Amino acid sequence: MCRVRYADHGKLRAETHIDEGVTGMIKELGITVLSENRAGARGLLAEHGWALWVEADGRKILFDTGQGMVLTHNGRKLDVDLSITDDVVLSHGHYDHTGGLDAVLAEACRPDVYVHPAAFQAKYGKGADGVARSIGCHVRSADEVRSRSGNVVLTQLPTEIVDGVWVTGEIPRRSDFEDTGGPFFLDEKLTKPDPLVDDQAMYIESRKGTIVLLGCAHAGLVNTLDRIAELTSRDEIHAVLGGMHLHAASEERIERSVEALERHSVRVLGPAHCTGRQATSRLWARFPDRCVECPTGSRFAF
């Protein structure tokens, strides 16, 4: 059963409580949305971005950092103290997930930053006018992160942050109907496609089951969920929250993504950020009692 409460009378409170109980690694898990495309309560700000504050048995983890325009503001409004951040996980190297890294490094005391080395590469998108635009992380190396008081953990392979909390590392691209959702490029001339090998997800073994946090799922939603099921040796996934980058997806890809969510018995589904209107509408129509909203200020307790 999923009970949702959103902001009421201007109070900054938006919570989702998951009530089923299954024994797992993390006994107390709370997740707060700090950056998303929509604001969920009076006084909060929105941006095209994604950032989650994760509290796992006392461990404070920031999953992505948004563009950086709303992170500290929303943190203050939501009583999230970024200065006590233990770990930062970057799902990939795009600006709307890494832009707040400077602010976190300035406030926190040497957090561990979990990131794939390719996230520091120059990255470009193609604008509507056909002109290249830079969409990468402004921090261009692990050494630069270290110089700004951050410890760096490179995550090509699955990496455990703390008991029960993992970063997937690189995700194998096995499906023949998924792509990065681009076009994305590694050069300003737009001649070298970016395979986004840096794309990764975080998953948590909670009392309720496996909780999956996505950045944009550029590796493909199906590839990502299948990889996590492989890593946990369990097909069942309790919750999936985050961007799924299906805004330009084909009908086949959307339908097969829906089938994968059913196959993995996902009980709580929070399509957010870059999922896209068509795909989000399809997910809410197919899973009306499993879907939850994820604007800034939303809180989830598992």
Where are these regions (language model features)?
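Short, Lys/Arg-enriched N-terminal segments with co-localized hydrophobic residues
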Residues: 6-24
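Conserved beta-strand hairpin/beta-sheet module of binuclear metal-dependent hydrolase folds
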Residues: 29-78, 195, 199-214
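Short, acidic Gly/Pro/Ser/Thr-rich loop/turn segments
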Residues: 38-41, 70, 120-122, 173-177, ...
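Divalent metal-coordination and catalytic microenvironments
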Residues: 54, 75, 92, 164, ...
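Active-site metal-binding motif and surrounding structural segment of the metallo-beta-lactamase
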Residues: 70-121, 230-239
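Cap/insert and terminal regions of metallo-dependent hydrolase folds
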Residues: 94-97, 112, 190, 194-212, ...
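Metallo-beta-lactamase
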Residues: 120-200, 263, 292-302
